[in-house]
């Protein structure tokens, strides 16, 4: 049969045998491994992840999320040489429209799957990477715009915190986050030894992270993130208050060799980013329940305090 021939009754509409032979010979001549080396999408992603050693805990957790998704999704069981550009696009569209995954989640998933397929191309297992396209042309970017809050909003919020009977106990920490530009995980990772009160400097060379139930110490997000920053007078006073009011448990908790953390929760465990995110959220909610002029949602994120409204 050739492409123009009609398909006999009871036969499958496969590529004509001559075309299949040409494709096989072409792959052999180009040293492309036949049948995608028998790898499924899940197999390929696992193989790719196995090459990524020395990554951070958060990155490793993200890999696990993608593996779990592909393990349950029929797309993960498909053979990689059968995935076309349109298949890749349709899958991502389904993740958003049917599975209701956010743009940022899909961006992270593709951030693992695309380099996995590129590895197969580089290894001469595939001829093309079906995920080599602009994501924004396929799925809708529903990510919330993030921008720093205004100086006026900052002053309004901090004044409210300082004078509130409940949230005033978090004022020093919130003030430090606003004024130093520290990441929230860098602040929660600070220990007494990181504060040089005599020379008024803050040593930042690690961060306290939580992934699921695992609380651990990690390096700073980037190499330049390791730094020593000066304390201005107002920040110095806030750290003085924190040290004076610090109430550690009888046995100082130790995490990956670090102890002497500055802030503790009601169970005597070092506070993590999640605690402070909740304090910010609840404080804004309380403010907005009292005053007519509303504050936006305020989140300690990265090195700036952002609004997400």
Predicted segment positions?
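N-terminal core-binding DNA-recognition domain of tyrosine site-specific recombinases/integrases
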Residues: 12-13, 37, 46-125, 165-166, ...
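Conserved tyrosine-mediated DNA breakage-rejoining catalytic core shared by Y-recombinases
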Residues: 136, 189-247, 253-254
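Short, basic (Lys/Arg/His-rich) helix/loop patches that form interaction surfaces
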Residues: 159-170, 180, 229, 245-254, ...
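Generic recognition of well-ordered alpha-helical segments
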Residues: 19-22, 43, 47, 65-69, ...
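Basic, Lys/Arg- and aromatic-enriched nucleic-acid-binding interface segment
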Residues: 107-111, 126-128, 132-190, 198, ...
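Short, surface-exposed polybasic/aromatic micro-patch for ligand or macromolecular engagement
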Residues: 1-35, 222
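Conserved hydrophobic/aromatic pocket- or pore-lining residues that grip, position, or stack substrates
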Residues: 45, 88, 113-116, 124, ...
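Short alpha-helical segment immediately N-terminal to, or the first helix within
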Residues: 95, 176-177, 309
């Amino acid at each position: 049969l050739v492409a123009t021939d009609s398909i006999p009754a009871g036969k499958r509409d496969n590529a004509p045998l001559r075309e299949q032979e040409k494709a096989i010979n072409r792959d052999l001549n180009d040293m492309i491994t036949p049948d995608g080396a028998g790898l499924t999408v899940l197999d390929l992603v696992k193989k790719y992840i196995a090459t990524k050693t020395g990554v951070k805990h958060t990155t490793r957790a993200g890999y696990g999320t993608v593996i779990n998704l592909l393990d349950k999704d029929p797309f993960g069981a498909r053979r990689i040489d059968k995935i076309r550009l349109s298949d890749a696009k349709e899958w991502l569209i389904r993740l958003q429209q049917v599975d209701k995954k956010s743009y940022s989640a899909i961006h992270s998933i593709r951030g693992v799957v695309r380099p996995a397929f590129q590895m197969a191309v580089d290894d001469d297992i595939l001829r093309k990477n079906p995920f080599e396209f602009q994501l924004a042309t396929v799925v809708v970017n529903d990510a919330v715009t993030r921008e720093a809050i205004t100086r006026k909003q900052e002053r309004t919020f901090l004044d409210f915190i300082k004078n509130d009977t409940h949230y005033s106990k978090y004022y020093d920490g919130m003030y430090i986050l606003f004024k130093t530009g520290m990441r929230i995980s860098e602040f929660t990772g600070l220990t007494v030894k990181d504060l040089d009160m005599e020379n008024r400097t803050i040593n930042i060379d690690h961060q306290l992270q939580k992934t699921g139930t695992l609380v651990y110490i990690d390096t700073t997000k980037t190499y330049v993130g390791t730094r020593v920053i000066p304390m201005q007078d107002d920040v110095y006073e806030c750290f003085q208050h924190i040290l004076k009011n610090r109430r550690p448990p009888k046995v100082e908790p130790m995490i990956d060799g670090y102890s002497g953390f500055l802030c503790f929760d009601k169970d005597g465990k070092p506070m993590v980013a999640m605690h402070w995110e909740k304090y910010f959220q609840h404080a804004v909610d309380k403010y907005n329940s009292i005053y007519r002029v509303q504050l936006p949602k305020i989140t300690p994120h990265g090195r700036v305090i952002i609004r997400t409204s």
